[in-house]
Structure formats: C-alpha cells, structure tokens
C-alpha cells in the first residue's frame, strides 16, 4: 500500500481516483463522517496519506467481521 499512496497530502480528486469512486462520494463521506479524516488548508480540503491508509485498513477489517 505504501507504494500506491503519494508522499504528499491528497485532494478529494486524488482520493476519488485512488479509490475508484466519484468525487461526490468523497464529499458524502466527509459530510457523514464515514470516510478518512480530512483537514482544511484555508478553503481547500486535504487528506493525509497515513490517515487514508489507516481508514482503508479499518474498512478491510470491518468487511471481515
């Protein structure tokens, strides 16, 4: 997984492309607080690749249970 995620903060478009989902899904996750933790830089939404990795691993674990 570390080879897949870039070393920079991700935009919502980056996250959507990485996960293969529409950008609107990323925004819905944010509104519902079900997606990876994001933060604002001024008006811009960003995601830390480490938080995204942790969220993906959590989703994989939830899917198993």
Predicted regions and their residues:
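Serine/threonine-rich, low-complexity intrinsically disordered segments
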Residues: 13, 36, 63-64
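Polyanion-binding surface elements
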Residues: 1-28, 58
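Hydrophobic aliphatic residue packing
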Residues: 11-12, 21, 41, 45, ...
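A short, Lys/Arg-enriched interface patch at domain edges and termini
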Residues: 50-65
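Major-groove DNA-recognition helix of helix-turn-helix-type DNA-binding domains
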Residues: 18-46
